[in-house]
Amino acid sequence: MIGKLIKKIFGSKNERELKRMGKVVTLINALEPELQKLSDEQLKEKTTELRNRYSAGETLDQLLPEAFAVVREAGRRVLGMRHFDVQLIGGMTLHEGRIAEMRTGEGKTLVSTLPAYLHALAGKGVHVVTVNDYLASRDANWMRPLYEALGMSVGVIQSMQPAVLKRQAYASDITYGTNNEYGFDYLRDNMALSKQDKVQRPLNYAIIDEVDSILIDEARTPLIISGAAENSAEMYKRVNQLVTKLTRQIDNGEDGDRRVISVAGDFTVDEKSRQVELTEGGHQHVEELLIKANLLAPDQNLYAANNLTLLHHVNSALRAHALFHRDIEYIVQEGQVVLIDEHTGRTMPGRRLSEGLHQAIEAKESVEIQSESQTLASTTFQNYFRLYPTLAGMTGTADTEAYEFREIYGLDVVVIPTNRPIQRIDMNDKVYLSLEEKYAAIVEDVKAFSANNAPVLVGTASIETSEEMSRRLTSAGIKHQVLNAKFHAQEAEIIAQAGRPGTVTIATNMAGRGTDIVLGGRWESEVEKLENATPEQIDAIKAEWEKRHDIVLAAGGLHIVGTERHESRRIDNQLRGRAGRQGDPGVTRFYLSLEDNLMRIFASDRMRNFMQALGMEKGEAIEHRMVNNAIENAQRKVEGRNFDIRKQLLEFDDVANDQRQIVYHQRNELLDAENIRDTITVVRADVLNDVVSQYIPPQSIEDMWDIAGLEKQLEVDFGLRLSIAKWLEEDTRLHEEPLRKRILDEVQATYDAKCERIGEIMLEIEKQVMLQVLDNSWKEHLAAMDHLRQGINLRSYAQRNPKQEYKRESFELFQQLLQRVKHETIHLLARVEPITREQMEAMEIQRREELARQKMQMRHEQLSAMPESPEAESEPAAAPQRQAPVVREGRKVGRNDPCPCGSGKKYKNCHGQLE
């Protein structure tokens, strides 16, 4: 009550922000008459003037009114588009490092020019981030005349672009590109062999278009640069054949504490958490099948440590069959399994599921199984974009995720008012008992809307549903066009004509996002089809478009038909936002049934029972605000669960991210340094001290010393034969500290002599050796971290907190990494022999060829929230113990040794195939 009263007196936070920025808009408007008097050249010179003022100490905040006024005037002259006052407010929101929620058709692309120009004055570069190459190129070329009229350079980065062109694009004042390409370039730069190989400048300011898509929908998608690993294609095929013989257990829910099973089976499926688990009987059945197929020894257990790889194959195959369905989560295209983005309905070529799941689906679909890969470098969008000192974003739907933006990224959301009042009508949902009734109602309503000359957009959540709707509309004789992942190439043309009178378009989720549906269709598309169109032809096309536009307005504008609710309210709002652009009329409605996934899995039993108790006749629908509220509550549950998963993934990746930043910082220092001799000297002293301490414990008596062992170790590590025992016999005053110093002096003198013999090239060798050791060790460390994270869930069963265990053990692994880099570097430098400049260059070429063979991948993490028992929180921490990822138990078996399973075969031809 008090909160409402305060809000009424002082206004909401959003209203107060808009009021504050409105005062600055008044200042910008006051500058407009003076700027209109300037010539084009004088307007261009304003950029130099503003840059000089920034260099002299003025802040970007102080320059903002004049800079925005300059951009507005350039837009009016060059593009014929003058920024509205609300667009200026959007620009200020972006400048301040926040998210501007702007409705569809409110000109987000034009808004971005304001803060992009302002921040480019600082000379540190501005990155404008889009979701695909087409939008990056389109927006850059569309806004290029405006920027160039003000003396600003514009660059575009695209996938597969040569490094020299990328370097030029990044050197521009304003750079357009995709989130994927920015992230991959960051990773590649941190694998570069020299400073000259890098393409990016230090990160400064980024504006993310469709920020919700990139920072929330893509948050669970790590960017990974990988190299080829061992091929296990045959194992995937064999396990896939076995899994098809397993049956699913059907549960009828719970009766008190007892689970009621209607059909016993080998595995259970939890659709909410997307998990598959073997039942007790299923575990026995799988072991029997594996033994029969000679994949498991008769006396072996599937859960033994040396069979973890086999268990991993079984679990992956189970998930591929039970959780992933063709034409819903993926399609098979040209002999490849291509994933479908659940949020947009677009295909994602080149993107693969991690942890062997993609290979399991390939085996299921009987297509070529691509080899698994080894991670060489990785990051997440969450951690990459948090590297920018200032980050901003634009989208039509951010307010429902405002808490997550603030919690994860520290970004506040400001809802920007529309330039014209919204005329769209959002109708209550219609809820039917069955899918069949729902589809029949949709067909009837679409037929009526289309007959009334209203354009109709039918939004679906999957390719399967879009094709089902297409079949039903065809049967009803309704002409329509389909826009889904299978028809990606025709997307622009379909969207361009989707606003014509009576046109019916079926689209998966938000396919076509980023392009407005214009009422009456886009007349520009018709002009583009004509070669050398005359003014008369253009006028005729415009006149025809005016007629169509008026017909559509009279029919109530674009009609949106949602065939089901998405898990996220934000995706539903995006679909609704396709109608009612720039004050146009429009109507939206969602059609649901109790058999829809969201209703079946997440809606409460109470609502289901309530609807059935009403005794609804076949074909009847419930249309009430109470039903809408119940559905929104179900969506909030799912959103909360997904947020917890994303937050938890971030907490795990934050551990790796801290380590990544340390390694990349050290690597950059190595690249920048001309001479690392002093660093090598310090590292050598540390390594030598560690080696000596193993055989001469600090502050120990001489009887505890292992001099013979020390002499042998020094020969192994440093290639030196030192007669330490003889030194001690000859000099009784040679105690621990003097002895350490003498050993170090001998090692240093030997190394100095080698450097003298090899010459100046030794400086380059030192640098390259340390870089190579760091890269190889980091690669091994990433693999160890992957193994650690995959098994860390199980710690909760031992009453331990998985997060705390992960942090502790990853820290130990990182300490080992740093020690390994030091020891390996000194060991290699001690063994290095003189080489020529030509040999050095040949080694460099070989490393570059290896880099060129690496693949850029985006993997979907299929991780659910990790279990954390309350007991784990309160239990005292266990004594620290060094723990490496479990790979095998017992003695390591040679590849040509007899297999321990007793089959009589060589290990490499039997169970060694699993490694």
Swiss-Prot record:
The keyword Calcium does not apply. The keyword Nuclease does not apply. Coiled coil: none annotated. GO terms for cellular component: cell envelope Sec protein transport complex; cytosol; plasma membrane. GO terms for molecular function: ATP binding; metal ion binding; protein-exporting ATPase activity. One of its GO terms (biological process) is protein import. ATP binds at Q87, G105, E106, G107, K108, T109, D516. Keywords: ATP-binding, Cell inner membrane, Cell membrane, Cytoplasm, Membrane, Metal-binding, Nucleotide-binding, Protein transport, Translocase, Translocation, Transport, Zinc. Belongs to the SecA family. This is Protein translocase subunit SecA. The lineage of its organism: Bacteria, Pseudomonadati, Pseudomonadota, Gammaproteobacteria, Cellvibrionales.
